[in-house]
């Protein structure tokens, strides 16, 4: 025998036609391979060498000649019952035969002696029953239709006649019907075996009833089968010499233990559990059971019941079957008590014990189930708990009890449940065998093997490894048997034959079970070592079998391995191999069960014979299974096998469905195709002589003439066609592979030649006959036609004359009627047009009058507001001037005072003056309050005026005459408005003149400064030496630097003068623009008559916006979403210009005030060089108060014209550097003053020239407070200044205690590193805060600690690529700011809280508001003590706020930078896939060839600014501005989403609904998953660093804004604005929505709403019937958030010429086109812009912090043991 050691693939190896012998011509019927249907039949329509074109029913296929199989044209409709009778024995022939018989409900087919059974998934009563068994009784095999009864009968007859034991092997995959086939076999054998009695019960009845018992405890529902056997079973039925059943034995293999504790959805656990839960009520009460959903071992799956199966009836049937097989009622009760105990055992949950480190039952519910389980097991409850929660380790001389953690206790519980169930099942099998009884004197046996088929799943573990080993063994046995049958066939026919090569899988068996060195041997060896893991096992396997051709290692796996089985490659996961291979029982469980009071339970766990485990021999599941398998094969080798291969026709378990690919795979895995291949290797075609001659006698007719011998005739016939290699047997002709096809080709050639001769003769006869008939008929037809034509012509002539007359009269009547109708229509149209024109004119005049009234009221309000502001500024200037005059008088008095008493009197007078000034300030405050009241009253008046206007608008619709009168009065009001505007222009000119005067004043002051500087230089030279002697601590370098600062400030004054000049120029331009707009307003025409109705609505919106403007007083007009029409636009421009003029006037006034302050400052520098240090300090403090008030006014003005400040950003940035250097100089001077306090005081008392140097320090302090350092380049309102005298403040500063600088280094070294988090709170922020509070640094007037802490926060920006580091410092800085906000209060804060100012709109405004406002965190006083903060602390909080926004901006930019290329790749991938899809399915759609309308008719920029953000902003985070919040989503968005779901119902977040499934590795779906991956990575970074939820929501909102902008702008491109693209993007958006729901709203917030533009655009794109959409539906329901430009572009781009119903109606497009103005020509205003602004304020962070208790935060490890930082533990 020749053994062929090679692996043959599945494709094309079973063909009996070799490529060289295939003869294919045009017209041949062949089979071609197809990936979907396995094989398709068709006709060859073209043959080109080795390639042919085959026309199938559904498509045309081009294939190679050697890749096709011939088709039998004479194939019977119902197929053949034995596939060896097929003319062509190949894969397509086998599939066709099985399918034909399956459709005819003939589910059984022979392949030689092999029976193939196809599961019908329905009842077929005609195939079973006693009458059917009677038919097959004693019938020869193959005489009747194929049936399992025939196989059983053949086995029984051979056993009786030949005296040889038989075996029937039933195999197939789960759900193929193995169990049912086994039942029928046993039923027939019991029928044939008679009725021998054994103890009152028949043996055959016990054998049959053992099936339901074993099914109840060994079968379960799986995904593939509702009654899947989870164990292998071999039933040995013993017969005596009379052929009667004398005994039986059941052997089981490899029960699936893990199913007891772990069930996957939608599978079920073993049937017995559900039967017991459905038992009668008294049974369930006894076992304290309930519904299956209440038990952990059953509720892991949602499937608790099976269709058409009643578990309660099955329970009673099982109990009845137990009675039959000999299980007593007491034993049955014990069995089900154990089953119930297992269920209760699974409900025991464990938690960590409070008394020890071990585990204990979690709650009362767990203890209840523990108690019930102990009761059912009849064991001690405490002992059961200890066995589950403890382990006893036996050492030399003692035993150690080790407590288990909750997880290990749960594993111990599951281990006990599995071993108890396994022991119970083994007991049942043993009991059934003992009950049935085995006959030791039996002569023969018939074994029925019900074994699992070949299995290959996504995850393959130890069970699949053992199952596939079994199938490899059985396949080898099967191959050898089939080969033997083939040899017997050839020997019987007495033909010459050679040995046949067939596949041998011995190498796979050696790989698995060879000892030593096999996989099982290595697995057992690994199990013997306690430290072995699946990693070491896998490594050992790789080292041992790395070069084996049947063993491979997967590329991306570390512990998996792949074995090349006969049915395909299977990859096994080794994670649970070691645990599943170990066959041991936990000692505690063994002792507990053995000590049970129930004899049944204790019998399941008998005492071990060997007390010491060391002396016992190691045993494993793999070794035991191998031994059982070897014993099974030895038994099979002693018997004659019969094979039944069960096939599952489909995976949906439904009848009438036959899946070719699935069936073919099962035939290959079951070895059927291998048997066919072995047959094909010899003589696959075998025809009896009579059939062969009947089919091919036309090839040699002379061989069959008269009387002939069949053998000689066959030889002559084969010699005629020159066929070689055939064999002539006794009754059959044996042909080689391909010879049958060659004979068919010769036969078709002969038949074709004969058919052509017959066709030629018949065609000749028919053509001659037809010609003669046509000749005689044509003669008669011609005569008849000529007469008929003459008659017809006469009638036509008469008819023509009559018709001419009738037409003349008819045309006359039609023309008259049409003319009359036209006249009537013209009159009607003219009257309608005149009426419409009159109505339009009336409505226009009505609206114009209302607009004029509104404008007049607004202008009056604006003028009054300007007047009040001017009055307020004048009062402030007067107060400042009076203060300055009083200061001069005070200086004169001090210069006259020589003695100490005089000085004290002067001081007293000065204090009185200060009190007077204080009263003046109080008076000014009262005036401000009065102004506020006046302002409020004006607002109320304006509201009432607006209400009156609304009433007037309603009254305008009463009569036409009243409206005309109101229009005349409106014209008079317009003239008054023109006069007011002229006055306003005059006032503007006056302001310009005032600016000129201020410039002159500045110039004069500059000259004074120069003179004072020259005098100062001369004086300084004379007193330089004396100053050095008396005040040696003053450094000359400091003086030089201060002089340099003075020069820089001079340059600053000149810069501000230039700024004023530029503002004057802007004022002139504004004035000219106002005049031009007034002229344009007077000469505007009356267009857009069709939009008058819409203008009325827009006018109402304008009134609403004006009300909002008066309420907010911040100059920001609320967006008006429907401003259209030239006339309304001009009126809006006019109102806007008035607002601009107001803003310019306020700006000029504010600049004037600023110049006044600078002038006062310079004049004070000249005067204060002659005063003492303390006197100058007092005067400076008062001046600073005034400057603070003035700067606050300037801040209000700057908010109104914030956009104008962008022009001076560069200059202010340079100013920041100057301020920073000044601050550093001030700190140095302050330190020097503190160190040499005594020397400087003595110098001030004794030196006559002490007025020089101290003045420099004074200048430094003055300018430090005037220009505080800011972070973003904007002017900041002054920091709160202590209310005490400047001199007293200086004295207190000199007296402050020394800070603990020696501990600062330790603190900085600790917090500069990542010290992590404690209870989700940052340790670094908590440590810094506690140290600053403890050291009282917030109350210090001067300290450098804050300057040393700030650079630590700057380290987060040094590495902007490290997102984790940025998130860490973002959490620390925000938490520290929260702590500062709740703890610090401004030193100048009074008890009365002022009225809350409007929310600032700029980055600088938010910072200063957070700087000024007290902490907004609502915390009780006992949590933290309020601290009276000084300037350094407030400045530190300001810098901290700036760092938070800087770090946030960098982090957001990193996210955007990572997300942008991935989104671009996604969009590009969708474009490519959309083009491919469109080329195949949408070739008729050519909408993209039609260019859309020019963008010149899109909406104006004003509309775009209302719908989108306020434009692209600077990426400089320090100067960033907040964007306008997007308008909230309208309720109609929900309707849009609902409509989107209706249009695309399958668009759900699952992989099954994807529109395209590209085969490339870089598919768009994978790229979209990259976006989800980035979002998951971002979410993980935020969670890891405990970023506050408020900031996390802002980050995700801004990220989703960027996604919305990129996706929406892409959809507005021509290639992306398609139906297919919309569906694909919508699928991914559903996945993104699913991700948002999984990420929870706490982190993502309202991020999903940021995609509203893209979602609404997709609604329009994926709507199929776009022609039914109206304009109102489009703008109100479908896409309310999209602008007119965007809607117009989408409607034009998605237009398809050949599908009018899929296009938007032309009326809607024309309406959109009318609304698009000509101003946007060549613009791209339809695109969305990215918004890089900071979307939050400092107070919002503090308000959003949820955690307000930091008492449980642990300090850093480095500081915990330091005694100097013991306060951190308090």
Swiss-Prot record:
One of its GO terms (molecular function) is cytoskeletal motor activity. GO terms for biological process: actin filament organization; actin filament-based movement. The lineage of its organism: Eukaryota, Viridiplantae, Streptophyta, Embryophyta, Tracheophyta. ATP binds at residues 172-179, 225-233. Residues 1494-1506 have a biased composition (Basic and acidic residues). Residues 774-803, 799-828, 822-851, 847-876, 870-899 form the IQ domain. Keywords: Actin-binding, ATP-binding, Calmodulin-binding, Coiled coil, Motor protein, Myosin, Nucleotide-binding, Repeat. SMART domains: DIL (SM01132), IQ (SM00015), MYSc (SM00242). This is Myosin-10. It comes from Arabidopsis thaliana (Mouse-ear cress). PANTHER family: MYOSIN, MYOSIN-10. Homodimer. Residues 78-748 form the Myosin motor domain.
């Amino acid at each position: 025998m020749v053994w062929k050691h090679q692996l043959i693939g599945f494709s094309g190896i079973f063909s009996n036609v070799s490529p060289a012998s295939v003869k294919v011509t045009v017209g041949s019927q062949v089979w071609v391979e197809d990936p979907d249907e396995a094989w398709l039949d068709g006709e060859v329509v073209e043959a080109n060498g080795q390639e042919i074109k085959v026309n199938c029913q559904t498509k045309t296929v081009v294939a190679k000649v050697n890749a096709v199989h011939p088709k039998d044209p004479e194939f019977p409709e119902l197929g053949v019952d034995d596939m060896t009778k097929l003319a062509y024995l190949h894969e397509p022939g086998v599939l066709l035969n099985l399918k034909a018989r399956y459709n005819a409900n003939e589910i059984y087919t022979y392949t030689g002696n092999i029976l193939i059974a196809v599961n019908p998934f329905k009842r077929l009563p005609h195939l079973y029953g006693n009458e059917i068994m009677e038919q097959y009784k004693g019938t020869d095999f193959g005489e009747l239709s194929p049936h399992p009864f025939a196989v059983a009968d053949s086995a029984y007859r051979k056993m009786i006649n030949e005296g040889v034991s038989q075996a029937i092997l039933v195999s197939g995959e789960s759900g193929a019907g193995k169990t049912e086939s086994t039942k029928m076999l046993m039923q027939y054998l019991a029928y044939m075996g008679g009725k021998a009695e054994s103890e009152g019960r028949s043996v055959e009845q016990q054998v049959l009833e053992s099936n339901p018992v074993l099914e109840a405890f060994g079968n379960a529902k799986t995904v593939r089968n509702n009654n899947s056997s989870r164990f292998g079973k071999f039933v040995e039925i013993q017969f005596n010499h009379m052929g009667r059943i004398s005994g039986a034995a059941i052997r089981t293999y490899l029960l699936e233990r893990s199913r007891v504790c772990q069930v996957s959805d939608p599978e079920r656990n073993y049937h017995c559990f559900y039967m017991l839960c459905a038992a009668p009520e008294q049974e369930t009460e006894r076992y304290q059971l309930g519904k299956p959903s209440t038990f952990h071992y059953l509720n892991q799956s949602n499937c608790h019941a099976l269709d058409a199966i009643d578990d309660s009836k099955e329970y009673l049937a099982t109990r009845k079957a137990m009675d039959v097989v000999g299980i007593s009622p007491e034993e049955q009760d014990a069995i089900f008590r154990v089953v119930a105990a297992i269920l209760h055992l699974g409900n025991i949950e464990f938690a960590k014990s409070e008394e020890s480190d071990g585990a204990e039952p979690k709650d009362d519910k767990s203890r209840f189930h523990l108690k019930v389980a102990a009761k059912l097991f009849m064991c001690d409850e405490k002992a059961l708990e200890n066995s589950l929660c403890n382990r006893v380790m036996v050492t030399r001389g003692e035993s150690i009890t080790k407590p288990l953690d909750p997880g290990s206790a749960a594993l111990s519980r599951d281990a006990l449940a599995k071993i108890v169930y396994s022991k119970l099942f083994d007991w049942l099998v043993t009991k059934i065998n003992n009950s049935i009884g085995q006959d030791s004197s039996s002569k023969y046996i018939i074994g029925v093997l019900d074994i699992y088929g070949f299995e290959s799943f996504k995850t393959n573990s130890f069970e699949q490894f053992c199952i596939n080993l079994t199938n490899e063994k059985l396949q080898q046995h099967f191959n050898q048997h089939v080969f033997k049958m083939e040899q017997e066939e050839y020997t019987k026919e007495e033909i010459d034959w050679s040995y046949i090569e067939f596949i041998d899988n011995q190498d796979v068996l050696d790989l698995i079970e060879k000892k030593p060195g096999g996989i099982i041997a290595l697995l057992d060896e690994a199990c013997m070592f306690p430290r072995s893991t699946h990693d070491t096992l896998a490594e050992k396997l790789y080292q041992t079998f790395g070069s084996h051709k049947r063993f491979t290692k997967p590329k991306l796996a570390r512990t998996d391995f792949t074995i090349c089985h006969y049915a395909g490659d299977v990859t096994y996961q080794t994670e649970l191999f070691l645990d599943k291979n170990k066959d041991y029982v936990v000692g505690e469980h063994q002792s507990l069960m053995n000590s049970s009071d129930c004899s049944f339970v204790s019998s399941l766990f008998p005492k071990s014979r060997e007390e010491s485990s060391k002396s016992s021999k190691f045993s494993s599941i793999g070794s035991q299974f191998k031994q059982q398998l070897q014993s099974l094969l030895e038994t099979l080798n002693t018997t004659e096998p019969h094979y039944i291969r069960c096939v599952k026709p489909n995976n949906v378990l439904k009848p009438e469905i036959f899946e070719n690919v699935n069936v073919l795979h099962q035939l290959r895995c079951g070895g059927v195709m291998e048997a066919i291949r072995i047959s094909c290797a010899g003589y696959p075609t075998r025809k009896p002589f009579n059939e062969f001659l009947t089919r091919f006698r036309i090839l040699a007719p002379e061989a069959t003439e008269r009387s002939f011998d069949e053998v000689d005739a066959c030889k002559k016939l084969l010699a005629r066609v020159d066929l070689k290699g055939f064999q002539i047997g006794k009754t059959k002709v044996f042909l080689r592979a391909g010879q049958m096809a060659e004979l068919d080709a010769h036969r078709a050639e002969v038949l074709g030649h004969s058919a052509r001769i017959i066709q030629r003769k018949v065609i000749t006869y028919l053509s001659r006959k037809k010609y003669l008939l046509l000749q005689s008929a044509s003669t008669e037809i011609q005569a008849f036609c000529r007469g008929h034509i003459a008659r017809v012509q006469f009638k036509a002539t008469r008819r023509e004359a009559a018709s001419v007359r009738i037409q003349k009269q008819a045309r006359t009547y039609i023309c008259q009627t049409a003319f009359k109708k036209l006249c009537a229509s013209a009159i009607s149209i003219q009257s309608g047009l005149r009426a419409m024109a009159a109505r339009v004119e009336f409505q226009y005049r009505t609206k114009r009058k209302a607009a004029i009234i509104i404008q007049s009221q607004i202008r009056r309000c604006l003028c009054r507001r300007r007047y009040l502001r001017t009055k307020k500024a004048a009062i402030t200037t007067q107060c400042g001037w009076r203060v300055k005059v009083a200061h001069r008088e005070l200086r004169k008095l001090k210069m006259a005072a020589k003695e100490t008493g005089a000085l004290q009197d002067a001081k007293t007078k000065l204090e009185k003056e200060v009190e007077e000034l204080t009263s003046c300030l109080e008076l000014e405050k009262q005036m401000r309050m009065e102004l506020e009241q006046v302002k409020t009253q004006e607002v109320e008046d304006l509201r009432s005026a607006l209400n009156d206007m609304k009433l007037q608008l309603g009254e305008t619709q009463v009569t036409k005459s009243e409206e005309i009168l109101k229009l005349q009065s409106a014209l008079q009001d317009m003239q008054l408005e023109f006069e007011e505007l002229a006055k306003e222009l005059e006032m503007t000119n006056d302001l310009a003149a005032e600016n000129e005067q201020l410039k002159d004043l500045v110039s004069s002051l500059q000259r004074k400064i120069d003179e004072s500087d020259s005098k100062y230089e001369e004086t300084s030279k004379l007193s330089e030496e004396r100053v050095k002697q008396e005040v040696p601590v003053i450094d000359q370098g400091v003086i030089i630097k201060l002089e340099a600062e003075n020069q820089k400030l001079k340059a600053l004054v000149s810069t501000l003068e230039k700024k004023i000049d530029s503002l004057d120029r802007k004022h002139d331009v504004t004035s000219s623009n106002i005049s031009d707009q007034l002229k344009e307003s007077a000469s505007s025409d009356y267009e857009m008559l069709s939009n008058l109705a819409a203008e009325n609505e827009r006018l109402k919106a304008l009134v609403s916006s004006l009300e909002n403007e008066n309420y907010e007083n911040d100059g920001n007009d609320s967006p008006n979403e429907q401003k259209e029409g030239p006339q309304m636009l001009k009126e809006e421009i006019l109102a806007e210009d008035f607002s601009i003029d107001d803003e310019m006037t306020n700006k000029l006034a504010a600049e004037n005030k600023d110049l006044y302050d600078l002038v006062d400052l310079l004049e004070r520098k000249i005067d204060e060089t002659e005063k003492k240090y303390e006197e100058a300090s007092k005067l400076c403090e008062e001046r600073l108060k005034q400057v603070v008030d003035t700067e606050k006014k300037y801040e209000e003005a700057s908010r109104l014209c914030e956009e104008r400040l962008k022009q001076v950003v560069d200059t202010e940035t340079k100013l920041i550097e100057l301020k920073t250097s000044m601050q550093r100089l001030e700190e140095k001077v302050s330190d020097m003053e503190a160190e040499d306090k005594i020397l400087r005081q003595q110098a001030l008392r004794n030196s006559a020239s002490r007025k020089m140097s101290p003045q420099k320090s004074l200048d430094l302090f003055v300018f430090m407070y005037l220009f505080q350092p800011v972070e973003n380049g904007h002017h900041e309102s002054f920091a709160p200044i202590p209310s005490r005298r400047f001199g007293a403040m200086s004295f207190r500063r000199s007296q402050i205690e020394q800070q603990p600088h020696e501990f600062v280094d330790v603190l900085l070294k600790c917090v500069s590193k990542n010290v992590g988090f404690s209870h989700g709170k940052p340790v670094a922020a908590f440590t810094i805060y506690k140290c600053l509070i403890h050291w009282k640094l917030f109350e210090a007037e001067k300290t450098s600690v804050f300057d040393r802490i700030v650079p630590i926060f700057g380290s987060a920006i040094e590495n902007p690529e490290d997102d984790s580091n940025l998130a860490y410092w973002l959490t620390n800085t925000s938490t520290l700011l929260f702590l500062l906000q709740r703890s610090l209060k401004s030193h100048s804060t009074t008890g009365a809280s002022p009225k809350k100012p409007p929310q600032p709109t700029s980055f600088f405004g938010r910072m200063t508001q957070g700087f000024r406002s007290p902490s907004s965190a609502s915390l009780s006083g006992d949590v933290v003590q309020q601290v009276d903060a000084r300037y350094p602390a407030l400045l530190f909080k300001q810098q901290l706020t700036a760092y938070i926004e800087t770090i946030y901006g960098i982090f957001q930019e990193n996210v955007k930078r990572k997300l942008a290329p991935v989104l671009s790749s996604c969009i590009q991938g969708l474009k490519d896939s959309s083009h491919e899809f469109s080329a195949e399915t949408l070739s008729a759609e050519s909408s993209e060839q039609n260019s859309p309308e020019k963008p010149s008719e899109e909406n104006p920029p004003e509309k775009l600014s209302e719908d989108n953000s306020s434009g692209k902003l600077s990426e400089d985070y320090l100067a960033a501005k907040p964007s306008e919040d997007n308008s909230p989503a309208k309720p109609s968005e929900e309707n849009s989403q609902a409509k989107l779901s209706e249009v695309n119902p399958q668009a759900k977040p699952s992989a099954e609904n994807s529109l395209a499934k590209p085969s490339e590795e870089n598919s768009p779906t994978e790229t979209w998953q990259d976006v989800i991956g980035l979002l998951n990575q971002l979410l993980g970074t935020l969670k890891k660093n405990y970023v506050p939820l408020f900031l996390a929501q802002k980050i995700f909102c801004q990220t989703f804004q960027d996604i919305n902008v990129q996706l929406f702008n892409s959809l507005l491109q021509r290639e992306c604005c398609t139906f297919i693209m919309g569906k694909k993007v919508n699928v991914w958006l559903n996945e993104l929505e699913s991700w948002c729901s999984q990420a929870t709203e706490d982190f993502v917030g309202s991020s999903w709403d940021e995609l509203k533009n893209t979602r609404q655009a997709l609604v329009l794109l994926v709507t199929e019937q776009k022609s039914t959409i109206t304009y109102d539906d489009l703008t109100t329901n479908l896409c309310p958030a999209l602008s007119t430009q965007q809607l117009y572009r989408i409607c034009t781009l998605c237009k398809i010429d050949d599908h009018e119903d899929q296009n938007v109606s032309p009326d809607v497009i024309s309406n959109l086109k009318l609304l698009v103005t000509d101003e946007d020509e060549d613009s791209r205003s339809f695109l969305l812009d990215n918004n890089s602004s900071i979307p939050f304020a400092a107070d919002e962070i503090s308000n959003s912090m949820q955690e307000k208790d930091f008492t449980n935060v642990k300090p850093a490890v480095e500081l915990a043991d330091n005694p100097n930082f013991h306060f951190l533990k308090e």
